[in-house]
Amino acid sequence: MFDTASLKYDANGLIPAIAQDHQSGEVLMMAWMNAEAVRQTLDSGRVTYWSRSRQGFWVKGESSGHVQKLVELRVDCDRDCLLLLVDQTGPACHTNRRSCFYTAIREGQEVVIMAPQNPSA
């Protein structure tokens, strides 16, 4: 059985987790997990993060319906970052965009490269 203690967490007991669409390879978002969030994710198959602002667990899509189902969890070579291959339902970003990475720096200017899926976002 996978031991979450084998991961390298920061001073706050957190590890960065990058969510990526398992089919398209699109990077969706980055959030934080602690050991218990990793355990809950592996046990339930629904991605659970640790919210630094709320200081509590955050099951992705619990309130919005924009669920992330875990397909595979990967650990980087230094064991200090996770890659979550997910099946994403709806937008991943709280701005109703498919990805949280919706701005780019092009020719020295920041530009929005992805519109919200729901214009009322």
Curated annotation (Swiss-Prot):
One of its GO terms (biological process) is L-histidine biosynthetic process. It is found in: Cytoplasm. It comes from the Bacteria. Its cofactor is Mg(2+); Zn(2+). Keywords: Amino-acid biosynthesis, Cytoplasm, Histidine biosynthesis, Hydrolase, Magnesium, Metal-binding, Zinc. It holds the Pfam family PRA-CH. It catalyses: 1-(5-phospho-beta-D-ribosyl)-5'-AMP + H2O = 1-(5-phospho-beta-D-ribosyl)-5-[(5-phospho-beta-D-ribosylamino)methylideneamino]imidazole-4-carboxamide. The keyword Acyltransferase does not apply. Gene3D superfamilies: Phosphoribosyl-AMP cyclohydrolase. Signal peptide: none annotated. It is an enzyme of class 3 (hydrolase). GO terms for molecular function: magnesium ion binding; phosphoribosyl-AMP cyclohydrolase activity; zinc ion binding. Coiled coil: none annotated. Pathway: Amino-acid biosynthesis; L-histidine biosynthesis; L-histidine from 5-phospho-alpha-D-ribose 1-diphosphate: step 3/9. Binds 1 Mg(2+) ion per subunit. Zn(2+) binds at C77, C93, C100. NCBIfam families: PRK00051.1. This is Phosphoribosyl-AMP cyclohydrolase. It comes from Paracoccus denitrificans (strain Pd 1222). The lineage of its organism: Bacteria, Pseudomonadati, Pseudomonadota, Alphaproteobacteria, Rhodobacterales.
